[in-house]
Design a protein with these regions (language model features):
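A short glycine-centered flexible hinge/capping loop motif at secondary-structure junctions
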Residues: 113-117, 323-327, 364-368
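Amphipathic alpha-helical coiled-coil scaffold segments and their short linker/junction regions
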Residues: 1-3, 35, 49, 55, ...
């Protein structure tokens, strides 16, 4: 597109064999040889070509920003599914630990029943509680496998191919105490969707200038320089030199309003792009504010869940000790064990939700991802 600002130069060479008609006076057949250069230049007086270059450059930047948007979305989806995987693993670990604890409780109740210190209903209630916990484990295992498979597919691998790589105990990644959103201008500069919308607006604005320039006269200059001769050997001689210069000024005098309508249509397209950009900015700011509020609430919720889980563990241990000492009934043991399982499971869910909302916040801010992150993840997976 930039080449439109400069003259175009072409070179040519050829030979022509001709014979005149007999009824206008027959002349001997002759061959004419020629070689030379032609140059043409449309001077960009009113900026139409420059506006076209600006529009093309802005379109290219918008496409690049759209690609960045896809990359950010992919990285966010990978991170979210990884958190889902860790959540299922944590909840599975909690369920299995509680299953082991309830099995111990069942054994204690069975011994007390054999010693005549507990009723048979206590044994059956302990067994019921244990089996209810066992029944919830398969669903968590299915969720874990689904998260592993989804993560593999997102990284371009076949389902199940990451199972060995992701094996082992993996804690939740740490989270920052606070996230600085920065000023709105920072968000506008970072978010790929807003960059794409702004570049689209710039392209449509440039096209308005391009349409306007078409309504004004165009100035064209031309030049040719070469040689002509009746023999190839004579080309290049002083007598064979030929040259010319030309110039033209052209303007549309009447087109039925076509060019004027083109300007009006493009102006409407530019207005649509402006409205889309403004709407995108407001939606982005709203998304950031909502994500900040959600993350702040998540941190408070996690702190409360941690305290509740700690208290539930202490209560479960105390009630078991009291029961073994004959100072508490078995219903209290069952109640505190169920409360502990629920509190620990809710804590794991809250921990995962907080990190998922942090991912949403980073995505809303248009930052938080290092350049090339998707490519690096793919390389690690392939190796």
């Amino acid at each position: 597109a930039v080449g439109g600002l400069f003259p175009s130069v072409t070179g040519s060479t050829g030979a022509t064999r001709s014979r005149s008609a007999a009824n206008i006076g027959a002349l001997p057949a002759r061959t004419t040889y020629d070689a030379g250069f032609d140059a043409a230049w449309e001077i960009d007086i009113f900026g139409g070509t420059r506006r076209g270059i600006e529009a093309a450059t802005a379109d290219q930047a918008a496409v690049a920003a759209d690609l960045d948007k896809v990359r950010v979305s992919l990285v966010a989806e990978v991170a979210r599914n990884y958190i889902d995987l860790l959540s299922y693993r944590r909840r599975l670990s909690i369920a299995r630990d509680n299953l082991a604890s309830q099995s111990e409780t069942l054994q204690i109740v069975a011994w007390r029943y054999q010693a005549g210190l507990a009723a048979s209903t206590d044994v059956e209630q302990a067994r019921t509680s244990r089996e209810q916990t066992r029944a919830g484990i398969p669903d968590l295992e299915v969720g874990q496998v689904a998260a592993e498979n989804r993560l593999a597919v997102l990284l371009g691998s076949s389902p199940g191919s990451l199972r060995v790589m992701l094996a082992g105990d993996r804690p939740f990644p740490p989270v920052p105490a606070s996230v600085g959103a920065g000023i709105p201008a920072d968000i506008l500069a970072r978010r790929p969707d807003l960059v794409a919308a702004e570049r689209t607006l710039a392209a449509e604005t440039a096209r308005v200038g391009q349409r306007l320039a078409q309504r004004f006269p165009s100035l064209n200059l031309g030049a040719s320089f070469g040689w002509q001769a009746y023999s190839f050997a004579a080309l290049g001689g002083s007598g064979s030199l030929a040259r010319s210069l030309s110039g033209s000024l052209a303007a549309t005098l009447f087109d039925g309003g076509r060019l004027k309508s083109a300007v009006a249509i493009q102006s409407a397209v530019q207005e649509q792009a402006l409205i889309a950009y403004r709407s995108g900015v407001l939606a982005a700011l709203e998304e950031v504010e909502n994500a900040l509020a959600a993350y702040a609430a998540d941190r408070e919720r996690v702190e409360a869940r941690q305290a509740a889980a700690e208290a539930a563990r202490n209560a479960a241990q105390l009630s078991r000790n009291l029961y073994q000492s004959g100072l508490a009934d078995f219903q209290k043991v069952l109640e505190t064990e169920r409360t502990r399982l629920s509190a620990e499971d809710n804590l794991a869910i809250a921990e995962a939700t907080m990190r998922s909302d942090l991912i949403k916040l980073y995505k809303a801010l248009g930052g938080g991802w290092e350049a090339g992150a998707v490519q690096e993840i793919s390389k690690d997976t392939a190796s």
